[in-house]
Design a protein with these regions (language model features):
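Nucleotide-activated donor-binding/catalytic signature segment of Leloir-type glycosyltransferases, i.e.
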Residues: 250, 260-287
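Nucleotide-activated donor-dependent transferases that construct or modify glycoconjugates
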Residues: 3-28, 45-49
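Nucleotide-sugar-dependent
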Residues: 22, 229-232, 281-287, 293-317, ...
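C-terminal alpha-helical cap of glycosyltransferases
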Residues: 358-364, 382-403
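Conserved acidic donor-binding segment of nucleotide-sugar-dependent glycosyltransferases
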Residues: 341-350, 357-364
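Conserved donor-binding/catalytic core segment of Leloir-type glycosyltransferases
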Residues: 11-13, 167, 216-232, 238-241, ...
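Carbohydrate-associated surface elements
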Residues: 172, 193
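A short helix/loop element that forms part of the nucleotide-sugar donor recognition site in Leloir-type
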Residues: 200-215, 365
């Protein structure tokens, strides 16, 4: 007979290796971190394809929750309560296109029922196959779904009482989930959150960033943080930089290939006042946002503008730095707040440049930040988000508190 007291863990499953600079991985790791900060016995589970994956000891006992490695802590700005359990995925896993050598299949069909299940109270994942496997094995689950898909949900899963709640970030995706078979009462919209470490003022580190990026103390600094993709408005920002040659622009984020591509583009266009910094570790990003005179959110119009819930926007708020943003459908609810300093139409470099110039003239940089956005963002902490999600879980199914 199974001992119910052994079932204590709140499992967050990610189907990709860590760390990587993808926004969805930042979201998932911070969601797990928040649950741990609330006092739940939280374990972040993800595939490990490194040298340790072939260690016989790890293969014999693959689920071993442990302290989060320093590399992950710095990469995602995590705290010390979160545990991790990398699942060994030795060769030939993911080296051949086959269901039997797919790491997600192995995690769902083997590691979950035989190794993770005995101590698991609740599962939380953006991986639908893992959520399905948990429910089929009698484990309650929470599903996160942040992008439009046309694939219908399996009725036997979405109507199963073990599926506690599904979470998305904008109403348009909630509507498409319902259209695809998710019961309306089982899906909620919740914004992403901000990491509370972004609220800690770091004036010395901010000064170091300005000294590193600016030619002299009188120059202004505009910072963008996020993915380096066209729909995010990077090409627009490059054109804005061309219109404002005396202002320094800096972009944090992107894969090395994307950084190289944009560096080549600005070189060809002979634009010398925009720098691409690549992925900036989260423990360094907070001070970069505080170093800026203005933060840019130049998202373009189009399909992505209807469902994006930009993670970095909440970190922008926490920095207290003035923000210029394009008006896109998914941000409509913020237009009546004081959190964003200036709005302009998307896809228009000249209008964005006008807004930046106005903010630079009317909102001088404050070392302590502007209080409006700092106060506004407090409601969007990852911990508040985690608590809200867990309020939809049956009390008898909640994981163990270890505070």
């Amino acid at each position: 007979m199974k001992n119910p007291t052994l079932k204590k863990h709140y499992i967050f499953f990610i189907g990709e290796e860590l760390p990587q600079p993808e926004a969805h991985l930042v979201q998932s790791t911070n969601a797990a971190n928040a649950a741990a900060n609330l006092g739940y016995s939280t374990v972040l589970v993800y595939p490990d394809k490194g040298a340790k994956a072939i260690n016989p000891v790890n293969l014999a006992r693959p689920f071993q929750p442990r302290q989060t490695p320093t590399e992950l802590v710095k990469y995602y700005n995590l705290h010390d309560k979160l545990k991790v359990a990398p699942l060994p995925m030795p060769w030939p896993i993911d080296h051949f296109r086959s269901k039997f050598t797919d790491s997600n299949t192995i995690a769902s069909k083997y590691y979950l029922p035989f190794h993770i299940l005995p101590t698991t109270k609740l599962v939380h994942s953006r991986n639908w196959n893992f959520v399905k496997a948990a429910i089929k094995n009698g484990v309650p689950a929470i599903y996160e779904h942040h992008h439009h898909e046309d694939k219908p949900f399996e009725p036997e899963i979405v109507t199963n009482p073990l599926l506690q709640i599904a979470v998305t970030v904008v109403d348009t995706i909630r509507e498409s989930m319902i259209k695809n078979g998710m019961p309306p009462e089982k899906v909620i919209k919740l914004h992403n959150g901000f990491n509370r470490l972004f609220m800690q003022r770091q004036p010395e580190k901010a000064t170091e960033w300005r000294q590193k990026l600016l030619a002299d103390e009188s120059q202004k600094l505009v910072v963008y943080a996020g993915a380096l993709q066209q729909f995010k408005g990077i090409d627009v920002l490059i054109d804005v930089a061309h219109e404002m040659p005396n202002v320094q622009f800096a972009c944090a984020g992107g894969k090395p290939t994307e950084v190289e591509s944009y560096q080549q583009l600005v070189k060809e266009k002979q634009i010398h006042n925009i720098k691409f910094l690549g992925y900036v570790l989260h423990n360094e990003l907070a001070s970069l946002l505080q170093a800026a005179d203005v933060l840019a959110h130049p998202h373009c119009s189009g399909k992505a503008a209807t469902f994006t819930s930009p993670l970095k926007l909440f970190d922008y708020f926490a920095s207290g730095t003035p923000i210029v943003s394009t008006k896109i459908p998914s941000l409509v609810e913020f237009q009546d707040t004081q959190s964003i300093t200036a709005w302009c139409e998307p896809d228009n470099p000249s209008k964005f440049a006008e807004s930046l110039k106005w903010v630079l003239e009317t909102h001088p940089r404050k070392v302590e930040g502007y209080p409006d956005s700092i106060e506004f963002v407090k409601q969007f902490s990852w911990e508040n988000r985690a608590a809200k999600i867990l309020s939809y879980v049956d009390e008898s199914l909640l994981p163990q508190l270890i505070v």
